[in-house]
Swiss-Prot record:
It comes from Wolbachia sp. subsp. Drosophila simulans (strain wRi). It comes from the Bacteria. NCBIfam families: hemH. Gene3D superfamilies: 3.40.50.1400. The lineage of its organism: Bacteria, Pseudomonadati, Pseudomonadota, Alphaproteobacteria, Rickettsiales. This is Ferrochelatase.
Amino acid sequence: MKKAVILFNLGGPDSLNAVRPFLFNLFYDRRIINLPNPFRFLLAKFISAKRENTARKIYEEIGGKSPILENTKMQANALELKLNENRNHVHKVFICMRYWRPFADEVIESVKQFDPDEVILLPLYPQYSTTTTLSSIENWQKNAKRYGLKCNTKMIHRYYDNQDFIEAHTNLIAKYYKLARKIGKPRVLFSAHSLPLSIIKKGDPYASQVERSVELIVEKLAINNLDWSICYQSKIGPVKWLEPSTESELLRAKADGVPVVLSPISFVSEHSETLVELDIEYKAIIKDGYYFRVPTLSTDPLFIKCLADLCINLP
């Protein structure tokens, strides 16, 4: 049997000229801004124009483009190798980005050429949110219908509590905790992408799933009297978002004089929100030598095993 696995991710601009259209695509998503047209269109135009210069400066810090596609390609290659250890099926992994290339329509054409017996949709978002997982799945389904991809399709919605996912995080955090312990008693900050409270109040389970991921990791770490906190980053605009912010928790740690081990709990690949926000902007808050940023899971063998098992064990 031939199986196509579609890895969903956010996407990112591949040049500075792509920054504004990328931002427009992001804010035009009705799962991000729930307004009817033409209001959503006009607001997306306004926000993308207003934020372009700020965003361009962020991408200039990391070579003028987002590394998310290259990082996702490494994950896709590792996953395809792992899946094809099972010789009963032939797996091919495709990457589909939500707000920049490769878009769903391009990917669907490639999938049609592969002609699979089954399609598996696998978002690179461990914790489910309507703004990420659901948005990607809905967009895929709409384009699959439009471009005539008729195939048995299965979906993976979440894996925030998967044993291998938890263990992969635990191992990385333990390594950096040990380094930080040489300075003092560390505080572990689990930083997740924030969401507006209005979305959470509508029943989005994202925050509760982030909390459960962290609970399981803390339990697995089994460190006596572990000092830890969940915090949220990447807030924009004046509305109320999930709190506390990562910045405020770093300022608290600075005031307390403790080393910080920061784990990007909701991110599985490196991009602007880790490489700039965490590694440059937030790092500057903490005293030199007191900041230990845990890398994203990327191609960690346990994480790749987690993804492969999710695909293989689908009913």
